[in-house]
Amino acid sequence: MQFDNTLVGKVIRKKREQKGMTQELLSGLAGIARTHLTMIENGTKQPNFETVWKIALALELKPSELVEEMEIELED
């Protein structure tokens, strides 16, 4: 099981798209810049814990649900 720097962004993008949200909407709800979210989703910037927490809540998820999804992605 190897952690990939793009994994966090991949999972966030997947969950955002599943909910039919734009980057603009999600970033606004999470209180972060859209460009920051873009960099996270592209894997060029790693979010800190607080940012992951804000994004999870904006997606109406528990942060642990995002982590669980990352674990699933690692297994595939």
Describe the function of each predicted region.
Residues 44-54, 63:
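Short, basic-rich loop-to-helix N-cap that marks the start of a DNA-contacting helix
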Residues 17, 28, 57:
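Alpha-helical residues within the helix-turn-helix
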Residues 20-39:
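Short alpha-helical DNA-recognition segment
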Residues 1-18:
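A short, Lys/Arg-rich alpha-helix, primarily the initiator
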Residues 10, 20-21, 47-50:
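Residue-level signal for the short linker/turn that defines the boundary of a DNA-recognition helix
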Residues 2, 57, 65-76:
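Short, charged recognition helix plus adjacent turn
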Residues 12, 41, 67:
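DNA major-groove recognition helix of helix-turn-helix
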